[in-house]
Amino acid sequence: MPKVKLNHLLIAAIFFAATLSPLQLLADTVLPQYSDDVHLGVTSCAGSTCHGATSPWKGSTVLQNEYITWDRYDPHSKAYSVLLNDVSKQMAKNLGIGKAHEAKICLDCHADNVAEKNRGRVFQISDGVGCEACHGGGERWLGLHVSGVASHQDNLDAGLYPTEDPVKRAELCLSCHFGDDKKIVTHRIMGAGHPRLDFELDTFTATQPAHYEIDKDYYERKIVSNGMQTWAIGQALALEKRFEALLKMGETGGIFPELVLFDCQACHHSLMTQKWQPRPGTGLGPGVVRFDDSNLLMLQIILESIDAARGKALQRKTVELHKATTTNSKEFYRVAQSLRDEAKELVPMFSNYKFGKKDVENLLRKLIKRTKEAEFFDYVGAEQAIMGITSVLA
C-alpha cells in the first residue's frame, strides 16, 4: 500500500478513536468470569505493602487497606461460606444438585468460579467473590499494576476490568444480581428457598463498603458519573437484561413462562386481607400475573423528565406489554423485543447526557405524581422509587 494512503488511514483511525466515548471504547470488555486471563487469587493482593495494610496510608494514591475492608466488612467475602449453612444445604437438597458449595449453579455467583485452567497456584474458590471476580484475572495486569509506572489505562489495556465505568459496572453486577445468558436465578431456585433478588446500581454501589476514595487523583485517572446518571444507566441495563432473559427463555416447555421475570407479589400475598387495587400503568384487572415492570416505571419517569414525548411513548408501550400478557403471547414477545431494543438505545443516551439540577427537580416531581396515582402500590415499584430518590438526591 502506498505510504500516503497508509498515513491517511492512520489519521482516519486516530480521528475515529478520538470521537468515541469511553463507553464505546470499552464495548468489547469481557466479564472477568468469562475472560481467558488466569486469576491469581486474593492473596496476590493481600500483602501489607500492597492492599493489605491495616489502615489507609498517608500520601498514597490509593488507600492500601482494600483487602482488609473487603475481608472484614464486605458481604462478597462471605459469599462462599453462605453455601455451607443449613439453609443452603436444604436448598441444594430440594434442587437435587448435590452439595451447594460444589454445585456450579451456586458457585457461579457465590465465588470467583472461573474455569480450572484459569486458576493460579494460590487461587482458592473458598475466597468467595474476591478481587479478581470484579477486577478481572491479574495474569497480565498485576505486574504492571505493582510496577508503579503504569497508568490506569495501561492496566485496562492489560485486562483490568473497568469497574469505574457505570455501564461496565452495571453489566458486571447484574450478571449475578440478576443473571446473564449463562446463569440466572430461576423461579425453581427461588422455590427451593433462594431469596428474591433486588438490585439498583447506584444504591448498591453506595452501600458497599468502599475500598476506594473519589478524590482529585481518582478524577484524573477514572470515569466519575453522578448519582442520577448511574441510576439511569442501571435502570436501562437492568431492563435490557430482563427482556433478554425473557426472549431467550420464552415459554419454558410447560404452560408457564419463566415466572422469576414476573412480579412476585402478584401471587405471593396474603389471602386474609383484600389489598388489590388498580394500577393505571398496567391496564390490568385483578388476578393477573404481572410482568415485573419496576425498571420500566423508572425509565418512563427518567425519560419524561428529559424527553416528555419519548417518556409518554414508553408509557403507552408498557400498557401494550401488560395487556398482551392476557391476550396474545406472540404480541407479548413482539412488544418485549421492541422494549428490549429501546432499553439498549437508552444506555448510550444516558451515558452521554449531562444530568443537571433541573433534571433532578423534574424527576422528583414526576416520582411524587406517580406516587399519588398509586403507581408504586406494588412492592417492587416502591422499592425502585425509594432507591431512585436516594440516588438523585445524593
Show which residues each predicted segment covers:
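N-terminal secretory signal peptides that target proteins for export/translocation
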Residues: 1-7
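Short N-terminal segments immediately surrounding and downstream of signal-peptide cleavage
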Residues: 27-48
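Primarily the internal scaffold of c-type cytochrome electron-transfer domains
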Residues: 28-33, 54-93, 122-129, 137-390
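Post-signal peptide N-terminal segment of secreted/secretory-pathway proteins
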Residues: 92-132
